[in-house]
Amino acid sequence: EAFANAEAKVGILDIDVYGPSIPNMVGLGSHQLGGAQEGVLEPVEAHGMKIMSMGFLATKDTPVVWRGPIASQLVQQFLGAVDWGELDYLFVDMPPGTGDIQLTLSQTVPLTGAVIVTTPQEIAHTIAEKGLRMFQQVKIPILGIVENMAGFTPPGSDEIFHIFGEGGGTSAAEEFDLPMLGKISIKQELREAMDNGTVFTDDNINSIASLIAVEAMAVVTNEELSPFAPQEINMANDGETLVIKWQD
């Protein structure tokens, strides 16, 4: 919303197919899309942003039990069959990992860059490192790192307890020579705002998460669009080697 408040035209694409959370965060958890008109889906508008998510297509209690290729087809449809109109920025919320969805996105559109979100513990650092290296392989710039769950702040206190460890995001930023965009501690009021769909209201706009968004905005707006888009991204027959073909 920091971008929308700066009068930019913003879209949010939630491609966490198996666990979409954006609809709840913007107060549209019960919203369901109607059918496509002539094969085109209209994004939902909230807080000055256009939003599309699997959460608008399936009810809360409906599990999405899809194999990777089907999920990849949905990503392609969200990119090509949604009437986004004219946008300055399209932000994509991806699931954790380095699977079909990430590869499909990398193959389908040229991306300005990626922001890596991790948590402080060592095991999360290892997983984030794989994501960092994947984006490097497909030549997508990494704009910076955000450390989530960076300590617990009890209600009515400013003291931070590092119950999940400390420094995982900073360590990754130093290892890969990347900007550390900020740290988000666990706060009851922020959790309640996300659950209630009020995280983007005026009462919460000065939260630490919003301040980090402003910092990220400065990085993104200074990053030129990557002119590179891979011609083909596939897994080799051994199931372990990523094969990337670039245009001449």
Residue ranges and their predicted role:
Residues 16, 31-37, 54-70, 74-104:
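Switch II (G3) loop of P-loop NTPases
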